[in-house]
Each structure stands twice: as structure tokens, then as C-alpha cells.
Amino acid sequence: MNILGISAFYHDSAAALIVDGEIAAAAQEERFTRKKHDAGFPAHAVEYCLAECGLDLKDIDYITFYDKPLVKFERLLETYLAFAPKGFRSFVAAMPVWLKEKLFLKDMLKKDLALMAGISKQDLPPLLFNEHHKSHAASAFFASPFDEASVLCLDGVGEWATSSVWLGKGNKLIPQWELDFPHSLGLLYSAFTYYTGFRVNSGEYKVMGLAPYGEPKYVDLILDKLIDVKEDGTFRLNMKYFNYATGLTMTNARFANLFGGAACKPDSTVTQREMDIARSIQVVTEEIVLKLCNTVHKELQTDYLCLAGGVALNCVANGRILREGPFKDIWIQPAAGDAGGAIGAALTTWYEYLEKPRQISGSDCMSGSYLGPKYTNEGIRQYPVSYTHLRAHETADVIAYAVFCLKRGGGGGG
């Protein structure tokens, strides 16, 4: 049984191939196109996965997409109606791509797949759609080494959910509760990413990396004005300070006044203020995540926790969960963002749609995340032929040679 999972059309497009329940191959489209966070149809990633397993598209039994576009469109419409007439410009900007493409995503996917395989749309395998947060949860739990675990998914937004809790048992994921848009820890962090001059859905790691250089001067301000955090970790944002629900920017003038100036321009010089802001939102994020983990443990009483969603890429917060949290161990999906949704979509089809049993081997199913293309020595030798500025250097002790190059202060070769 061969199942192809696809994540696409938002950011970090990817494909994953499950063969008889095993993750046989997975890759992000950006690795092939060299376009950072490539959001297009992952044709190259799909082709790689099929080639890696010696399969054609006609050998695939099911194709599963990682979210449900029509439910997402429902959220967009309800949000615009709730805030109307505010957000009209954003509505006008968003509608053409939905009316032209995204509302017909099922047909668009079939068209792209059929064109790639050189077959008719009628000859394609069944196309399924999985809920966004369930794809995240499945990528975390079904790939983990645990037979039973709590699952916490935190991201910007899927269809409606921004935070969700699941109980994983064997081959089942049981939904517990969720927080919905616009109240989102991921979007709160992205708002500060935007405000400090970095790119949303790309530069969040820079904010995390900037945080140690600052002081948490704005923590109380954030908690007092921007977000109401309950003791159990659940929260609500004060949308008076944000623009992402209906606007073309993440924050507004009221937010700027709160922090003493307009949002930084991209590539502008980072000042101590931005460092302090980064430290402050990082501290707030960590405290919320820890509270949520304590609540999840109290409610579900499991020894283990699985994490996914873009917020689970915050390794500093993850470290605190491991050190200070109530769980014996945690497991984080390495591709915790939307790319990993391709894996989760395919695994959901295998375990829940097809009801296949799940065998626990004591280790995870990610093969050390070595699921993408691998290169032979002969293949590597061919690169200098195409790129004249590269030189090949062969050595029996790669580590010793790398240390030598680093000490010398230059690259290899010679």
C-alpha cells in the first residue's frame, strides 16, 4: 500500500511517501527549486519520493492533502464579515486567488498531478483531505516511539485551530480541545517578528536567536495589553493591537505606540530595543507553553508528550519543556511546520482511514530525518564539472580535514 502526502500552497510545500506504513521518503520543494519556503505545487518533491521508491503515480493507492481549503475559506469569510467594513482592502486582495484557484484546489491538484504523470485525471488514485492540525498531530504522534502520548500542536492557524490537544493511543488520535483564530500564539510571535523587521513565517528563528541579547523589559506590558493568559495556559489576544485578521500587516499604529515607534523596516540595523522586545516575547511564549504542558499532563495523565506545529520549532521553549515540564520524555516532529503536514496527512490515511495496526519498535519512524535525496561519492565528484569555482578534495578523515580548514580560516580544496 502506497500513500502520498502533500503539503502546498501556503508555505514550505512538501511531499512524503508512506509504503506499507513506513515513511519511505520525504522532501521539501525548496530543496529542489532553491526558493526559500517555496509554496508552489511540490512537483520536484513528489517526483523524488516516487523515484526513491521506484514507483510511478499509478502505483499510488491514496493521495492525501494536509488541510481542508473550503473550511479555511469559511474562516476567511466569517472573519471579514465579523470585522466589516474594516479589512475591505485585505478582502479585495485575498479574494481573487481564492475565487480563481484555491476554491478549486481539488481540481487544481488533480490537474498538476495528472500533468506530471502524463495520465488523465480520471486515472489518478483517490484524493483525500485531512484537517490541518490533525496532520500536525499525526506527524508528531504516529512517527513517535510512544504507544500512548499527549499531543500538543501550536502554530499560526490551520483552518480555524491555532492550538490543539490530542490523546494518541495506538493507531488513534482523539481530539481533546482547541483554541481558535484569531487567538494564536504563533501569530503573536509572528507579529513581533514583523515588528522587529524580520519576515513572517521565515524570521521567527531570528527573534528567538536575538532574545538572549536582550532584557525582558516588556513582559509585563505584553501580558497587560496584548494577551490575557489564564493559569491553565489558555489565552486570548487583544485584537485592538493587531492587524493580521483583516489587514495587510501584522500590527497596527496602536501596537507601534505601545512599543515606542513604527515597525522596523526589513534589513534595518537591530538596536537594543529590538533585542529587549525579542527577549520579552520569548519569555512570554515559554511561560505559555509550559503552562499548557502542565494542563495537558494534568488532564490526560500520560508520561509522554509529542509536539508539532510551527511553535514547536522554538527549541529554547522545547528545552524548558524537557527540563521543567511534567512529562518523562517528549518527542518533537523534526519537520514541525507545514512541511511535516505531508507526513502527517499520509500517516493519518494509513492508521485512521485504513485502520492499520501500529507497531512500536522503541524508536521513532523518521530514520534520523534522513528522508530526502542522498548523494554518492561519484555524484559529488560531478559537481565541480558543472561549477568551475568548486574543487574536489578527497580525504580518508573528513573530520580532521574540516578542523584543519577551520583553523586555517578558509575553505577546502588544494
Located regions from the model:
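Short stretches within intrinsically disordered, low-complexity N-terminal or propeptide regions
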Residues: 18, 394, 398, 402-404
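Acidic-residue sensor for enzyme active/binding pockets
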Residues: 286, 394, 407
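Conserved small/polar residues in nucleotide/adenosyl-binding loops
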Residues: 388-395, 412-414
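Hydrophobic alpha-helical segments, chiefly the membrane-spanning helices
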Residues: 400-414
